[in-house]
UniProtKB/Swiss-Prot annotation:
The lineage of its organism: Bacteria, Pseudomonadati, Pseudomonadota, Alphaproteobacteria, Rickettsiales. Signal peptide: none annotated. Pfam families: DUF179 (PF02622). Belongs to the UPF0301 (AlgH) family. One of its GO terms (cellular component) is cytosol. PANTHER family: UNCHARACTERIZED PROTEIN YQGE (PTHR30327), UPF0301 PROTEIN YQGE (PTHR30327:SF1). It comes from Rickettsia akari (strain Hartford). This is UPF0301 protein A1C_00165.
Amino acid sequence: MGDKIFHNLSSKTLVATPHVITKGIYHKSLIYMLSHTEEGAIGLIFNRLVNHIDLKSFFKIKNDDITTPVMVPIYLGGPVEHEKGFFLHSSDYNKNLLLDFQNDLAVSSNLEISEDIAFGKGPKNSLFIVGYTAWKPGQLEEELERNLWLVMDCNKEFIFADNPEDKWHSALKHLGIDEIYFSAQIGNA
């Protein structure tokens, strides 16, 4: 057998296949891939809304100019390190970026962006995500071979759409797939 060809999925979106991942955090999840190398992969689930938080109290922003709560949705990015928070956001905001992508998206993980969002000076679009998803070397490739994920190009309007519950169905529709045509037995051609 020959060597497997590695396809970098950084900046792509993974779409959980129906009836294969049937429960848990990955059921009907969408994951924006932050990094994918031969050493492993890291991504953020962006459609698993868990709550809303007040940025001012959550980040202990001390400023009397903000008199009302600044409520933002909080998403669960995956099962790893829930104490870590990330802002997946549009690239119009470029202060102290953790990651900057070519598809008009960026990731920040610092207090400054939360303050800027609270003051209305942050990015046009953003999601606050806690935790992340990670794969060991070869693990994601194995899951792709087992048809646990579909891969699609990233679309920032899709990521920042208002209704997180509809994003997975919208992703299937974008791929030209109707969920009812999936069976529990799917395979590679």
